[in-house]
Amino acid sequence: AIDPALAPAYGLAVLDALEAAGHEAWFVGGWVRDALRGAPAHDVDVCTDAPWEESERALVAAGITVHETGTAHGTVTAVVEGKPVEVTTYRVDGAYTDHRRPDSVTFVTDVREDLARRDFTVNAMAWHPRRGLVDPFDGAGDLERRLIRAVGVASERFEEDALRLLRAVRFACRLGFAVEEATQEALVEAAPTLGDVAQERIGAELRGIMASGRAAWAMRAEREVMLAAVPELAAMVGFDQR
């Protein structure tokens, strides 16, 4: 369980503002994952059943500055004490024809539907200081098992956004986790699709892998993905690419 004392005041201010206006809101994603590990991040993301226009209205009414940062996907950014808090309406994603972003999103009213669109089980949890944890895919169990596991069918998650291949490796590196078996099979199979991902997106994930101190592990354990991301690495690892 997460100690409510770990929740930062700037995040709670956003929850309170939304709930005061009659909406439901949760902390979601990376903050929840890291707080369960006892190492909460500074970045707080909030999801809510409020449409973004109503989120903005509720936050502004509470004296919070709001920037319209991604309204097509239901996202605004609240700034409290100089800290940005992303606030996103619960949504499900349509088809990803460009393997990067959904062509369309549908806003929904159940947080569980929102969690189902996320990449890995450890990132698909929501938490509230009074209502506790919502964890439909046993992300907390995978944290204990030290596993990176795709939500639902792994191949579908990677087909939606090929960058998730590198995100899986980066999270495994950063957390010191293994990749779950079915997820690993899907990673290897989908590796060639990384060729379609923009270099700057790949670069950002690779920097995270390097910063983790486990890049050598990534080259050994996730060779197919790493070589698909950076074909030039093949020469360094003495890998016969015939």
Q: Where do the model's predicted regions map?
A:
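Catalytic cores of the polymerase beta-like nucleotidyltransferase superfamily
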Residues: 1-242
